[in-house]
Amino acid sequence: MAPGETEREAGPAKSALQKVRRATLVINLARGWQQWANENSTRQAQEPAGWLPGATQDLPHTPKEPGPRQHAPKPPSPKPDGDREGRGSEEATEVSHIKRKEVTRTVVSKAYERGGDVNYLSHRYEHDGGVSEAVQPDNDIDRILLSHDSPTRRRKCTNLVSELTKGWKVMEQEEPKWKSDSIDTEDSGYGGDMEERPEQDVAQVAAARIKRPLHSQANRYSETLNCKAHRKYSQVDNLKGRWQQWADEHIQSQKLNPFSDEFDYDLAMSTRLHKGDEGYGRPKEGSKTAERAKRAEEHIYREIMELCFVIRTMARHRRDGKIQVTFGELFDRYVRISDKVVGILMRARKHGLVHFEGEMLWQGKDDHVVITLLE
């Protein structure tokens, strides 16, 4: 038989063999999935209907070690029907190729952790009350008590401290208007006739002088000051005042805005700046326009410094120490960095950093113009 005829006959046989192998692999995979589904459904059916804390806990299953990799079996040879039925029962008991692994839960939510902290504290207070403080390990208790996990508690404490501080400052600044009802000023012994009184009167006056005001009056006065400070430094009043201030500023700005319906021509003309006034020709301080102008000035100044650095690195030095370069050479070098060569040169000359002849520079026409770096 010729070699060509052998190859032609082997081609269809090889393709048929590959088809049979693929079909067998798909059948085995489907059988494995079906077996896994049956086992999973059986295990779920055996589990309890509801969850009880600590009542039903499955024992940890040891993961099965995967066996050696099994290759796809060769296409079976035709056998009688009885053999097929026996083989089907044996294949049903084969171990599935799907790997399973038990996953244990290791992450506990924050709510459970806080509940555990509370239980731990109550247990320590109930059972370890008689133990001395030196023996108790206070690290865990201090960590729980001194922790600032709650932002609400932290915010309330901060507000309370600030209000109390402001109230006491106001109370220190204001002079007390109440008097001690223990003794009047006229009868306190202060005056010129102090020396003429007998020693008994002096002793009585000294004893009366060290008396303190009644607690009821002092408490009433401190409560009054605290109420005044609370009303004066209340958060609601502060928020209301800020909103009112913003509303007044907005109304005033709308009166000066020519594009607003509330524009007041007379007010705008009376408040406008004239030439020579401070702030004339500049944006209003604190506005967005002023911020953009500041950023633009910083950007232009940075580009001017870069231009001076390029001139300093590529130019030749004169005898007097100054650096010179022609406009054509600078244009060919700096145009790769920025296309604003002429504008930056004009700006640098305005600031006194460079000098060149003429009001404007043109490429090709003014390539011979000498640019001198002054600083």
From Swiss-Prot:
GO MF annotations, alphabetized: actin binding
One of the protein's GO biological processes: actin cytoskeleton organization
Main location: cytoplasm
Residue segments, region Interaction with actin: 234-279, 346-375
Gene3D superfamilies assigned: Costar domain (1.10.10.1540)
Region ranges (Actin-binding 1): 193-293
Record's function text: Acts as an activator of serum response factor (SRF)-dependent transcription possibly by inducing nuclear translocation of MKL1 or MKL2 and through a mechanism requiring Rho-actin signaling.
Notes on the domains: The actin-binding domain 1 (ABD1) is intrinsically disordered, and binds to F-actin with higher affinity than ABD2.
Name by which UniProt lists this protein: Actin-binding Rho-activating protein
Gene: Abra
